[in-house]
Amino acid sequence: MSNKTVVETVTALVEPILAEHNFELYEVEFVQEAKSWYLRVYIDKEGGITLEDCALVSDQLSEQLDSADPDPIPQAYFLEVSSPGAERPLKKEVDYQRALDQYVNVSLYQQIDGHKVFEGYLRQLSPDELTIEYMDKTRQKQVVIPRDKVAKARLAIKF
């Protein structure tokens, strides 16, 4: 079974479990690292996910996967259910919306104003652009970044 099919199947199995507990699905990935396969399910909720929440979803999803016929994942794998973390990637539009006025790290495909990475506050968001407020030495500046220039974006922790 292809990785994409596994992800789609697991997504269909886990969404009703998450809906029952008012959790949301952040991402499902099925990857091979060294010789082992990992099924990773990232979940979230308003106020943040707890270890108990992850254990609950892991137990219920494990039951669903074990009882599914035919077996959606015939090879051996490790199931991991977790939060996307404090420095979670911004992938979907809803992730960017939630990150408004949050401290973010944005990596670019090519430089803008001599920088390829900006770390600052996401102040504005449009379908085509992001506006980041950042510190350049001791001065506060803003940069408007076209979305097609963004290689990666994530929440960041300000030190």
UniProtKB/Swiss-Prot annotation:
Report the domain of life of the source organism: Bacteria
Name of the protein this chain belongs to: Ribosome maturation factor RimP
Instruction: Please tell me where this protein is predominantly located.
Output: cytoplasm
State the GO CC annotations: cytosol
Give the source lineage, highest ranks first.
Bacteria, Bacillati, Bacillota, Bacilli, Lactobacillales
Task: Show the HAMAP family listed in the entry.
Answer: RimP
Where does the sequence pass through the membrane?
none
Biological function: Required for maturation of 30S ribosomal subunits.
Q: Does the keyword Cytoplasm apply?
A: yes
The species this protein belongs to is: Limosilactobacillus fermentum (strain NBRC 3956 / LMG 18251) (Lactobacillus fermentum)
Concerning its family, UniProt says:
Belongs to the RimP family.
State the Gene Ontology BP annotations: ribosomal small subunit assembly; translation
Q: Which UniProt keywords apply?
A: Cytoplasm, Ribosome biogenesis
Q: Subcellular localization, per the record? A: Cytoplasm
